[in-house]
Each structure stands twice: as structure tokens, then as C-alpha cells.
UniProtKB/Swiss-Prot annotation:
The keyword Thylakoid applies. Sequence repeats lie at residues 42-148, 149-253. This is Photosystem II 22 kDa protein 2, chloroplastic. The keyword Thylakoid applies. It is a multi-pass membrane protein. InterPro entries: Chloroa_b-bind. Coiled coil: none annotated. The chain crosses the membrane at residues 86-106, 120-140, 184-204, 219-239. One of its GO terms (biological process) is photosynthesis. Its main location: plastid. The lineage of its organism: Eukaryota, Viridiplantae, Streptophyta, Embryophyta, Tracheophyta. Residues 1-38 form a transit peptide. GO terms for cellular component: chloroplast thylakoid membrane; photosystem II.
Length: 254
């Protein structure tokens, strides 16, 4: 019996050395949690999405002209507004000069008239073509109109602000209430008027008023009232600044 016990003890020792003690499920779960925490701590960062350039989107928004910028020579609406103001002054001065002297624009400049259009001076033809293209926006009318902000202080006229406020007009700013968009439209009309009056005078030898059978060569006080009103309208529209502004692709306030 003692011999059997002594033989069993080495067997137990051998079996104890041969097999490693198994860890409990709680210990295995803790090891897994530690492993997960380490992985989360060294997780690679996700790449940030590239920033979208919003300026390219704005370019398509501000091009609201007839031909856009791609079909022109880079004119902005502010440039076209300046050309329109010059055209309004020129058209008003030419009508006033013809009404007083009885001569058209070209006759006042001693240029040959009453000839076919292809025999006209090349520089004159270039000027007519430039004026026509500018009137329809083919030179490039990049930009869009943004009106001034309107609020309660603009809608209600405060009492006791002066003579203009008593008449229902704004104390500051232009008298007509024109915006730059309206002024641009009137400038285009003046450009068209100059171009077609020049074409008619080249062919017929008559000025713009003579083509309409309006009496010319008279003193200023005898000019037709409607004609005088048109002359004054173009003159004041050219020198009267309009409200609002033009915004271009570069987000510059014009």
C-alpha cells in the first residue's frame, strides 16, 4: 500500500510539470480588453477630405451676361457701365449739336457722308462695330448686380429731415433712384442709338434728327420739348451715380 502511494506521487508531479495551469475566463477577458485598448490607441487617423474651392462655383454664378466672359475680351460690367456713361454723354451732345447746327455727328467732324457703307473710313467702321458689340454685351460683361440692403430705416421716411425728405425723396444718395443695373441698360440704349445714327448718316448723309424729320438748325429755346427732355435725360443719367454695386469673379465690390 505504501509502495502504491509512493509510485502515485511521482506520477502526480510529472503530470503537474507536463500540463500548464489553465487561466480562468475572467483573466482571458481582461487580456482581450487590454489588447483592444492598445489597438484603439494606435489606430491610424483617417485622411481629411480635400477642401472644395468655392471660387470656381462662384464664377459660374456671377456670369449672367449674354455671352459670358469666355466670348469676350474680359470686360466687366463696371467697365461697360463706364462706356455706357460716355455713350450717353456723346449721344446727348450730338443731338444737341445737330439741333442747333443742323449737322449730324459726322458732318460736325467734317467726315464724308452719303456714301455706301463699305466706302466709309475703316476707323469709323471699327468704332461702329465696337459700339454695337458693347451694346449687346459681346465684349464680355462679367459680374452680377447686387442692390443695396433695404431695411426699416429705408422704408420709413423720418420727419424733419429736409426738403428732399418732405418730397418723399431720400436724403442721401442719387436723386433719380437709379440703380447701376438701370444705368447699364440706358447706356446700352445710348450705344445702340449712336451706332445706328452713324450708319444712317453714312448712307443717307442726314443726322439722327434729320432722319426722323425733326426740325434742326434752330436756337435752343425753340427745340422740340420731347427732344430737349431726351437730351436732358441722357445727360443727367450719365452724371447721376446709381445705387448698388457689381460683384465680379474675384469678389471685388465694384
Amino acid at each position: 500500500m505504501a509502495l502504491q502511494q509512493s509510485m502515485a506521487m511521482p506520477m502526480m508531479v510529472v503530470s503537474g510539470l507536463g500540463t500548464a495551469p489553465r487561466s480562468s475566463p475572467m483573466v482571458q477577458l481582461q487580456r482581450m480588453k487590454k489588447h483592444l485598448v492598445v489597438v484603439a490607441a494606435f489606430k491610424s487617423r483617417t485622411k481629411a477630405s480635400p477642401k472644395v474651392d468655392k471660387s470656381n462655383k462662384n464664377k459660374s454664378i456671377v456670369e449672367d451676361g449674354i455671352f459670358g466672359t469666355s466670348g469676350g475680351i474680359g470686360f466687366t460690367k463696371e467697365n461697360e457701365l463706364f462706356v455706357g456713361r460716355v455713350a450717353m454723354l456723346g449721344f446727348a451732345a450730338s443731338l444737341l449739336g445737330e439741333a442747333v447746327t443742323g449737322k449730324g455727328i459726322l458732318a460736325q467732324l467734317n467726315l464724308e457722308t452719303g456714301i455706301p457703307i463699305y466706302e466709309a473710313e475703316p476707323l469709323l467702321l471699327f468704332f461702329i462695330l465696337f459700339t454695337l458689340l458693347g451694346a449687346i454685351g459681346a465684349l464680355g460683361d462679367r459680374g452680377r448686380f447686387v442692390d443695396d440692403a433695404t431695411g426699416l430705416e429705408r422704408a420709413v421716411i423720418p420727419p424733419g429731415k429736409g426738403f428732399r425728405a418732405a418730397l418723399g425723396l431720400s436724403e442721401g444718395g442719387p436723386l433719380f433712384g437709379f440703380t447701376k443695373a438701370n444705368e447699364l441698360f440706358v447706356g446700352r440704349l445710348a450705344q445702340l442709338g449712336i451706332a445706328f445714327s452713324l450708319i444712317g448718316e453714312i448712307i443717307t448723309g442726314k443726322g439722327a434728327l434729320a432722319q426722323l424729320n425733326i426740325e434742326t438748325g434752330v436756337p435752343i429755346n425753340e427745340i422740340e420739348p420731347l427732344l430737349l427732355f431726351n437730351i436732358l435725360f441722357f445727360f443727367f443719367a450719365a452724371i447721376n451715380p446709381g445705387t448698388g454695386k457689381f460683384v465680379t469673379d474675384d469678389n471685388d465690390d465694384q
